[in-house]
């Protein structure tokens, strides 16, 4: 009599052993992923934090390394945290403001030693770093695939110019004459910034990355850009360079008491200068908006140096940034990508007050896309800020451009975990 199988029953000849002593199938080992954030600024910590949190813990054993200075803002970490040295934020920001080399050979040598220690202890399958330039050496020496997180405007293949940042010389001599000298000497300045990492790479038997600062900031076995091509276009990207999309994060803070009772009869301006904005600029902004028919909600990022808070302004140390941007008509910030991406994701235009090169590059991309206005900070005054706010509030084209970028952001951010997992599979 012929034997038959019912649905779901493979039958006696399916090749599956039912012997009691059959060895169980081996359980696939979870890949061990180490994320490293460079805590010079908050942005370079929260991006790897969001990435790490997005991965499926049943598939990945996640470890997170950073200086703990921002841990209180991150809240409870759902994975092991490993403290790692980062130079004080104030020191880095001061050097950037002065136009000085912010990572010298001695600093990077210490970073490499700290990296190698933690890489040896954790033995990850992959290391993901955000602005931790030393991983260009330490990960290669350890033979561990290295994924670099960066912004697309630092890509060697990006379509952009290099604007003059806010440096002491522009304050003393003015932007125009310094711009002429800057255009002449910028390649030399960038080459000097490349020296420390290239020297250490050669010392450890690795090839030089050359004299293009963009290669220093984007070096990795695999590089992910936290941008979209609609905002920062590139050309002829290498196969191991991919757009990731925006990495959005807001602190999990309790809204202030005034959050639910704001006036609704006037447009809201969300003002925040983040952890790297000028200390006195927020006061200039609040003074500029004091006599306008707007409501201002402002976050000081824990750096409250305000001497006067106008009647139309509501201030807190920290605000839920995505929610604040979503209820605003304009976001006014330091031009850095974390806050501008929150604004654009909500379809809200931006007024940026950039100081360093990173912020200038980001804001110039927004201006080219029609979704923002850049104000230089050297001689910033209340009249200029007020005029820019009036311009953006009255110009429908700014809102339309911001909404177009919000549509571009959508699919990239929705596929965020898949982007990461695809990258991990490609480098493993």
From Swiss-Prot:
Keywords of this entry: Glycosyltransferase, Transferase
EC assignment: 2.4.1.-
Disulphides: none
Domain of life: Bacteria
GO biological process terms, semicolon-separated: glycolipid biosynthetic process
The keyword Glycosyltransferase is assigned to this record: yes
CC annotations in GO: plasma membrane
Disordered: annotated segments: 1-23
Signal peptide: none
GO molecular function, one term: hexosyltransferase activity
A Pfam family the protein falls into: EryCIII-like_C
Family: Belongs to the UDP-glycosyltransferase family.
Annotated function: Involved in glycosylation steps downstream of mono-O-methyl-glycosyl-p-hydroxybenzoic acid derivative (p-HBAD I) and 2-O-methyl-rhamnosyl-phenolphthiocerol dimycocerosate (mycoside B) during the p-hydroxybenzoic acid derivatives (p-HBAD) and glycosylated phenolphthiocerol dimycocerosates (PGL) biosynthesis.
Database matches in PANTHER family: GLYCOSYLTRANSFERASE (PTHR21015:SF22), UDP-N-ACETYLGLUCOSAMINE--N-ACETYLMURAMYL-(PENTAPEPTIDE) PYROPHOSPHORYL-UNDECAPRENOL N-ACETYLGLUCOSAMINE TRANSFERASE 1 (PTHR21015)
This protein's name: PGL/p-HBAD biosynthesis glycosyltransferase Rv2958c
Organism annotation: Mycobacterium tuberculosis (strain ATCC 25618 / H37Rv)
Upper lineage: Bacteria, Bacillati, Actinomycetota, Actinomycetes, Mycobacteriales
